Amino acid sequence: MIKERVKMEVIGLEIPLISGNEDYTLAELISTYPLEDKDVIVIAETVVSKIEKNVILKNEITPSNEAMELSKKLGKEPEVVQVILDESNEIVKLGPNFIITETKHGFVCANSGVDESNTSKGIKPLPKNPDKSAEEIRMGIEKITGKKVGVIINDSMGRPFRKGSCGIAIGVSGVCGLWDRKGEKDLFGRELKTTEVGIADELAATASAVMGQSNEGIPLVIIRNAPVPFTNGTGKELIRKKEEDVFR
């Protein structure tokens, strides 16, 4: 007998194109939608970077000798390579036409998360502090609406040993980031010993499927009735420490 247990709603929202010259905050914009308690609001990092004016014009960049040399190997403009280097702690892997770095946030990804997509001009790094951005947006929404919500800032990144990019959570506020389920029992009463769920990543990927990664124009997703604890989670707790990384 099949029994319905969970019914989650995913709502993709179109918003005005963000230029960076807005006279309103993201919290104010999002609060114009009829939110409900325990909605999880997932926002594309592009929107956050643009409204925070975290876009760099190419004529403001002076490429270093290292950037000039790398640009030849990577087939990228020296200005873009310079921003990639500026946003990184270290180069993890370098090859023909690709560069994998550890960003200043601790993410290991291609190009330090830097790109020019969905930006009319300039080069767009990731938000400087995604957890702080998520926190400020959440607090603003809760102040305006009186609703208790969670906020996730997501980005699409490639995955080792898997093809295709997938949405991940880079900033989290108001919901659990890493859900530690150790000590709970499985269906047969056995105690879980190692289970940790990257629940914020799972929600980020769910939202990313609706957002799309081309010209869909849906940078905001509301996830309603999500089976997630509403705790003080962060995106940082999803980052594996270097000393725990068996591949580096």
From Swiss-Prot:
Keywords attached to this entry: GTP-binding, Ligase, Magnesium, Manganese, Metal-binding, Nucleotide-binding, Potassium
Biological or metabolic pathway of the protein: Cofactor biosynthesis; coenzyme F420 biosynthesis
Residues that hold a divalent metal cation 2 according to the record: S156, Q213
Signal peptide extent: none
Cofactor(s), names only, from the UniProt record: Mg(2+); Mn(2+); K(+)
Enzyme Commission numbers on file: 6.3.2.31, 6.3.2.34
Catalytic activity: oxidized coenzyme F420-0 + GTP + L-glutamate = oxidized coenzyme F420-1 + GDP + phosphate + H(+); oxidized coenzyme F420-1 + GTP + L-glutamate = oxidized coenzyme F420-2 + GDP + phosphate + H(+)
Cofactor binding comment, as recorded: Binds 2 divalent metal cations per subunit. The ions could be magnesium and/or manganese. Monovalent cation. The ion could be potassium.
GO biological process, one term: F420-0 metabolic process
Alphabetized Pfam families for the sequence: F420_ligase (PF01996)
Major enzyme class: ligase
InterPro entries: F420-0_g-glutamyl_ligase, F420-0_gamma-glut_ligase-dom, F420_ligase_CofE_arc
Keyword Nucleotide-binding: yes
Binding site for a divalent metal cation 1: D115, D155
Subunit details: Homodimer.
NCBIfam families named among the record's database cross-references: F420_cofE (TIGR01916), PRK13293.1 (NF009809)
Protein name as catalogued: Coenzyme F420:L-glutamate ligase
Gene that encodes it: cofE
